[in-house]
Amino acid sequence: MLTLLSPAKKLLSISKHYSKETSNPLLLDKALQLVKIMKLKSVEQIADLMDLSRQLAELNYERYQNFDLKNNPMNHSYPALFLFQGDVYQGLNANSWKDEEIEYAQSHLGILSGLYGFLRPLDRIQPYRLEMGVNLENPAGKNLYAFWSKIVTNILNQILAEQSNPVLINLASTEYFKVVDEKKLSYPLVTINFYEQKNSELKMIGILAKKARGMMAKYIMQNRIDSIEQIKEFSESGYLFNKEISSPNSLNFI
């Protein structure tokens, strides 16, 4: 199985030092095409493009200007698993993982990215800000979905083909998973959702759902889950699988 997560806007200022072997992003050449486009943007244009404050726009302007295209794009880079922070990654709590769990995740966990397309946990990336939903004009079209959809879908099919149980587990947000062309997926897709029950009414509360997605990904990686039935046994933070509101392609927890 391959489990998908979204990235995070918030990045750790100092990433965990990981002494084992790391990797380069599979789609680095494509990512550098987007970096070249972003290098041409002014602070004001970056602020407008991503609806950022002046301070954040200046930070990301500097990030793109300092992005080393010619010599070593991996300069000042960190493993994606440890760089991303935020609600999902609090639930994931990768700093507590054992080395063998990280190694397992390298071929069973993926992170969708507006800049890098698709990332494995140990892929080294530079700090950046570029959400998948941004309308950044590029050679493929008017937004990043046009740029990445075919490429990301193809890489997912390639990775799934190497899995013993080729099922795509979607724990990503709607904004990010839209980049996947479901019609072109060659393997089954299962989306997992988390709800809160308030006065007999079910609601998806963003911050709680994000943390739960991270906890589910952690559960799958640390226990080397390889079947849908095992996923249904997840019970962290009181969440339980609810058969009545679920379907073969949508597993819902309350």
UniProtKB/Swiss-Prot annotation:
GO biological process terms, semicolon-separated: response to hydroperoxide
- Superkingdom to which the source organism belongs: Bacteria
GO CC aspect terms: cytosol
Q: What family does the database annotate? A: Belongs to the UPF0246 family.
PANTHER family assigned to the protein according to its UniProt record, in alphabetical order: PEROXIDE STRESS RESISTANCE PROTEIN YAAA, PEROXIDE STRESS RESPONSE PROTEIN YAAA
Protein known as:
UPF0246 protein lpp1320
Organism phylogeny: Bacteria, Pseudomonadati, Pseudomonadota, Gammaproteobacteria, Legionellales
